[in-house]
Amino acid sequence: MLMTFTRIQNLPTNCRAHLYSSARENLLRFLESKGFKPHPLEVFCPSPTHNWVDVAAVKGADLWAFEYKSRSDSIRRGLEQCVSYSSAFDYVVIVADRHRVTASPYFSKFKREGFGVWRHIGCGFQSIIPPKRRRSTPAARAVVERQFRRFGLTPGGDDRSILDWVQVG
Protein backbone atom coordinates (compact mmCIF):
# COMPACT_ATOMS: atom_id res chain seq x y z
CA MET A 1 0.00 0.00 0.00
CA LEU A 2 1.45 3.35 -1.04
CA MET A 3 1.10 6.19 1.44
CA THR A 4 1.72 9.79 0.49
CA PHE A 5 2.28 12.62 2.90
CA THR A 6 1.36 16.19 2.15
CA ARG A 7 2.63 19.24 3.94
CA ILE A 8 -0.16 21.01 5.81
CA GLN A 9 0.53 24.20 3.82
CA ASN A 10 -0.31 22.28 0.61
CA LEU A 11 -3.70 21.13 1.87
CA PRO A 12 -6.83 22.96 0.74
CA THR A 13 -7.99 25.65 3.15
CA ASN A 14 -11.06 23.67 4.22
CA CYS A 15 -8.83 20.71 5.23
CA ARG A 16 -6.54 22.98 7.27
CA ALA A 17 -9.61 24.49 8.94
CA HIS A 18 -10.82 20.98 9.81
CA LEU A 19 -7.43 20.06 11.34
CA TYR A 20 -7.47 23.26 13.43
CA SER A 21 -11.08 22.66 14.48
CA SER A 22 -10.32 19.09 15.56
CA ALA A 23 -7.18 20.16 17.50
CA ARG A 24 -9.17 22.95 19.16
CA GLU A 25 -11.91 20.49 20.16
CA ASN A 26 -9.26 18.16 21.62
CA LEU A 27 -7.83 21.04 23.65
CA LEU A 28 -11.29 22.08 24.92
CA ARG A 29 -12.05 18.50 26.05
CA PHE A 30 -8.61 18.14 27.66
CA LEU A 31 -9.01 21.41 29.58
CA GLU A 32 -12.47 20.40 30.82
CA SER A 33 -11.01 17.10 32.07
CA LYS A 34 -8.44 19.10 34.07
CA GLY A 35 -11.03 21.33 35.78
CA PHE A 36 -10.88 24.31 33.41
CA LYS A 37 -14.06 25.96 32.15
CA PRO A 38 -13.23 26.87 28.54
CA HIS A 39 -15.08 29.54 26.61
CA PRO A 40 -16.87 27.88 23.66
CA LEU A 41 -15.67 30.49 21.13
CA GLU A 42 -12.48 32.35 20.35
CA VAL A 43 -12.20 35.26 22.79
CA PHE A 44 -11.50 38.90 21.89
CA CYS A 45 -8.47 40.34 23.64
CA PRO A 46 -8.21 44.15 23.71
CA SER A 47 -4.77 44.59 22.19
CA PRO A 48 -3.44 46.73 19.33
CA THR A 49 -2.45 43.51 17.51
CA HIS A 50 -3.43 39.84 17.71
CA ASN A 51 -6.91 40.26 19.15
CA TRP A 52 -8.36 36.75 19.01
CA VAL A 53 -7.35 34.04 21.50
CA ASP A 54 -7.74 30.50 20.13
CA VAL A 55 -8.89 29.04 23.45
CA ALA A 56 -9.57 30.93 26.67
CA ALA A 57 -10.55 29.28 29.92
CA VAL A 58 -11.32 29.99 33.56
CA LYS A 59 -9.82 27.93 36.37
CA GLY A 60 -10.68 29.16 39.85
CA ALA A 61 -10.19 32.93 39.82
CA ASP A 62 -7.68 32.82 36.95
CA LEU A 63 -8.08 33.56 33.26
CA TRP A 64 -5.98 31.41 30.91
CA ALA A 65 -5.17 32.03 27.22
CA PHE A 66 -4.05 29.18 24.95
CA GLU A 67 -2.59 29.87 21.52
CA TYR A 68 -2.59 26.77 19.31
CA LYS A 69 0.09 26.54 16.62
CA SER A 70 -0.26 23.96 13.87
CA ARG A 71 2.72 22.75 11.87
CA SER A 72 2.16 25.50 9.30
CA ASP A 73 1.90 28.36 11.84
CA SER A 74 4.75 30.66 12.80
CA ILE A 75 6.20 30.20 16.30
CA ARG A 76 7.49 33.79 16.15
CA ARG A 77 3.93 34.98 15.56
CA GLY A 78 2.87 32.80 18.50
CA LEU A 79 5.30 34.69 20.73
CA GLU A 80 3.84 38.02 19.54
CA GLN A 81 0.34 36.73 20.24
CA CYS A 82 1.29 35.58 23.75
CA VAL A 83 2.74 39.03 24.49
CA SER A 84 -0.54 40.63 23.34
CA TYR A 85 -2.67 38.31 25.47
CA SER A 86 -0.60 38.86 28.61
CA SER A 87 -2.31 42.20 29.29
CA ALA A 88 -5.69 40.50 29.85
CA PHE A 89 -4.93 36.99 31.11
CA ASP A 90 -3.31 35.62 34.27
CA TYR A 91 -1.66 32.73 32.42
CA VAL A 92 -0.67 32.44 28.75
CA VAL A 93 0.31 29.16 27.07
CA ILE A 94 1.42 28.27 23.55
CA VAL A 95 0.39 24.80 22.42
CA ALA A 96 2.30 23.14 19.58
CA ASP A 97 4.24 20.12 18.48
CA ARG A 98 7.10 19.78 20.99
CA HIS A 99 9.89 19.77 18.41
CA ARG A 100 8.63 22.89 16.66
CA VAL A 101 8.56 24.91 19.88
CA THR A 102 11.68 23.60 21.61
CA ALA A 103 13.79 23.75 18.43
CA SER A 104 12.62 27.28 17.69
CA PRO A 105 15.04 30.15 18.38
CA TYR A 106 12.11 31.73 20.27
CA PHE A 107 11.87 28.91 22.85
CA SER A 108 14.09 30.72 25.37
CA LYS A 109 11.96 33.86 24.96
CA PHE A 110 8.79 31.97 25.90
CA LYS A 111 10.59 30.74 29.00
CA ARG A 112 12.06 34.14 29.86
CA GLU A 113 8.68 35.89 29.42
CA GLY A 114 6.96 33.35 31.67
CA PHE A 115 4.70 31.91 28.99
CA GLY A 116 3.78 28.26 29.29
CA VAL A 117 4.66 25.79 26.57
CA TRP A 118 2.48 22.72 26.08
CA ARG A 119 3.12 19.83 23.74
CA HIS A 120 0.26 18.43 21.65
CA ILE A 121 0.48 14.63 21.48
CA GLY A 122 -2.35 12.94 19.60
CA CYS A 123 -5.47 13.84 21.57
CA GLY A 124 -3.54 14.76 24.72
CA PHE A 125 -1.37 17.60 25.94
CA GLN A 126 1.71 17.78 28.14
CA SER A 127 3.26 20.77 29.89
CA ILE A 128 6.88 21.38 28.89
CA ILE A 129 7.16 24.72 30.70
CA PRO A 130 4.51 25.74 33.24
CA PRO A 131 3.32 29.34 32.81
CA LYS A 132 4.07 32.01 35.36
CA ARG A 133 1.31 34.22 36.68
CA ARG A 134 0.99 37.45 34.69
CA ARG A 135 -0.12 40.81 35.95
CA SER A 136 -3.14 41.63 33.80
CA THR A 137 -4.45 45.17 33.48
CA PRO A 138 -7.90 45.69 35.04
CA ALA A 139 -9.45 47.26 31.92
CA ALA A 140 -8.27 44.50 29.56
CA ARG A 141 -9.24 41.79 32.02
CA ALA A 142 -12.75 43.29 32.37
CA VAL A 143 -13.28 43.00 28.59
CA VAL A 144 -12.40 39.30 28.70
CA GLU A 145 -14.47 38.63 31.85
CA ARG A 146 -17.59 40.12 30.19
CA GLN A 147 -17.27 37.57 27.38
CA PHE A 148 -17.15 34.73 29.91
CA ARG A 149 -20.17 36.06 31.81
CA ARG A 150 -22.27 35.87 28.63
CA PHE A 151 -21.87 32.10 28.85
CA GLY A 152 -22.41 31.87 32.60
CA LEU A 153 -18.70 31.45 33.35
CA THR A 154 -17.08 33.73 35.91
CA PRO A 155 -13.57 33.80 37.35
CA GLY A 156 -13.59 32.86 41.01
CA GLY A 157 -15.65 29.75 40.52
CA ASP A 158 -19.03 31.40 41.10
CA ASP A 159 -20.95 30.42 37.99
CA ARG A 160 -24.33 31.54 39.28
CA SER A 161 -26.43 34.12 37.55
CA ILE A 162 -27.72 37.25 39.31
CA LEU A 163 -31.14 35.55 39.24
CA ASP A 164 -29.81 32.94 41.69
CA TRP A 165 -29.37 35.73 44.25
CA VAL A 166 -32.76 37.37 43.77
CA GLN A 167 -36.04 35.87 44.90
CA VAL A 168 -38.57 36.07 42.12
CA GLY A 169 -42.28 35.80 42.78
Model-derived features: positions:
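Active-site metal-binding core of divalent-cation-utilizing nuclease and nuclease-like domains
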Residues: 7-64, 163-168
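Catalytic cores of nucleic-acid endonucleases
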Residues: 72-120
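Residue-level "edge-of-site" marker
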Residues: 44, 98, 123
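Non-catalytic C-terminal interaction segments of nucleic acid-processing enzymes
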Residues: 4-10, 32-33, 49, 111-169
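Short beta-strand-loop-alpha-helix junction that forms the active-site gateway
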Residues: 62-63, 67-76
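A generic structural signal for ordered secondary structure
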Residues: 57-65, 91-93, 118
